[in-house]
Amino acid sequence: MQIIHTIRELRAWRKNAGKVAFVPTMGNLHEGHLALVREAKKRADNVVVSIFVNRLQFGQGEDFDKYPRTLQQDADKLEAEGVAVVFAPDEKELYPNVEQRYSVEPPNLQNELCGKFRPGHFLGVATVVSKLFNIVAPDVACFGKKDYQQLAVIKGLTEDLNFDVEIVPVDTGRAEDGLALSSRNQYLSAAERDEAPRLYRELKAVAESLAQGSLDYAGLEKRAVQSLTEYGWVVDYVEIRRADTLEVARAGDKKLVVLAAARLGTTRLIDNLEIKLP
């Protein structure tokens, strides 16, 4: 396995790499990331994993400075999975002209759901993913469904900007108690970790009500928020949306997703659950 730090070197490698699958990450890899890598391996001759903590997608007061940088441990895990290349550029490599930086702005979704609470986040995501697609030139790229809104943004930019990349969604990895795997879970105290699976349980409760025919979307959302709040969560949102577009769900929609973001202590957790109605 190679660890490549420059765009020029990666492009030289890419010329003879055959079909390439790509998994972009910020490092600090866990089993959820490795599931993306395993899916990528099924779909290509070679897998490239990028590791880059992207300052653009962190807001003021967020955890950019304390986000764990664990390149050597990550590289060891990826080598064991048979990854061909780890692309680990520094900030100057990806953003050499900070004062003249062009960006990619998602038109519809960046101010809703997580975008409402993290201004500029999805602009940062869309910009770095566009740059990485141009650099890596993958045939396939794998993204986890845990970041459901991010996945929707990436599907949109891939289509609108004519990237010749197949986007492969991968199911959310979970701990045995249902908590979605996330690099930020390590910020949780022991007591918070015990409480954290409640977020997924509330999503399942909403999904069960929808499956039983409830059309009181606002009521279901409100009850989930109240329940989480009673247990000490600070809730950004619980919302039921159309799964394919993330538009506000309407009666008669069959493919839905319930999404949530909430803080437990100082840690912001997100999760979602897809629902297909008969």
UniProtKB/Swiss-Prot annotation:
<feature type="binding site">
    <location>
        <position position="57"/>
    </location>
    <ligand>
        <name>(R)-pantoate</name>
    </ligand>
</feature>
<keyword id="KW-0963">Cytoplasm</keyword>
<dbReference type="InterPro" id="IPR004821">
    <property type="entry name" value="Cyt_trans-like"/>
</dbReference>
<keyword id="KW-0436">Ligase</keyword>
<comment type="pathway">
    <text>Cofactor biosynthesis; (R)-pantothenate biosynthesis; (R)-pantothenate from (R)-pantoate and beta-alanine: step 1/1.</text>
</comment>
<dbReference type="InterPro" id="IPR042176">
    <property type="entry name" value="Pantoate_ligase_C"/>
</dbReference>
<feature type="binding site">
    <location>
        <begin position="181"/>
        <end position="184"/>
    </location>
    <ligand>
        <name>ATP</name>
    </ligand>
</feature>
<comment type="function">
    <text>Catalyzes the condensation of pantoate with beta-alanine in an ATP-dependent reaction via a pantoyl-adenylate intermediate.</text>
</comment>
<feature type="binding site">
    <location>
        <begin position="144"/>
        <end position="147"/>
    </location>
    <ligand>
        <name>ATP</name>
    </ligand>
</feature>
<protein>
    <recommendedName>
        <fullName>Pantothenate synthetase</fullName>
        <ecNumber>6.3.2.1</ecNumber>
    </recommendedName>
</protein>
<feature type="binding site">
    <location>
        <position position="173"/>
    </location>
    <ligand>
        <name>ATP</name>
    </ligand>
</feature>
<feature type="binding site">
    <location>
        <begin position="26"/>
        <end position="33"/>
    </location>
    <ligand>
        <name>ATP</name>
    </ligand>
</feature>
<comment type="subunit">
    <text>Homodimer.</text>
</comment>
<keyword id="KW-0566">Pantothenate biosynthesis</keyword>
<dbReference type="GO" id="GO:0015940">
    <property type="term" value="P:pantothenate biosynthetic process"/>
</dbReference>
<dbReference type="Pfam" id="PF02569">
    <property type="entry name" value="Pantoate_ligase"/>
</dbReference>
<feature type="binding site">
    <location>
        <position position="57"/>
    </location>
    <ligand>
        <name>beta-alanine</name>
    </ligand>
</feature>
<dbReference type="InterPro" id="IPR003721">
    <property type="entry name" value="Pantoate_ligase"/>
</dbReference>
<comment type="similarity">
    <text>Belongs to the pantothenate synthetase family.</text>
</comment>
<keyword id="KW-0547">Nucleotide-binding</keyword>
<feature type="active site" description="Proton donor">
    <location>
        <position position="33"/>
    </location>
</feature>
<feature type="binding site">
    <location>
        <position position="150"/>
    </location>
    <ligand>
        <name>(R)-pantoate</name>
    </ligand>
</feature>
<dbReference type="GO" id="GO:0005829">
    <property type="term" value="C:cytosol"/>
</dbReference>
<keyword id="KW-0067">ATP-binding</keyword>
<dbReference type="GO" id="GO:0005524">
    <property type="term" value="F:ATP binding"/>
</dbReference>
<dbReference type="GO" id="GO:0004592">
    <property type="term" value="F:pantoate-beta-alanine ligase activity"/>
</dbReference>
<dbReference type="InterPro" id="IPR014729">
    <property type="entry name" value="Rossmann-like_a/b/a_fold"/>
</dbReference>
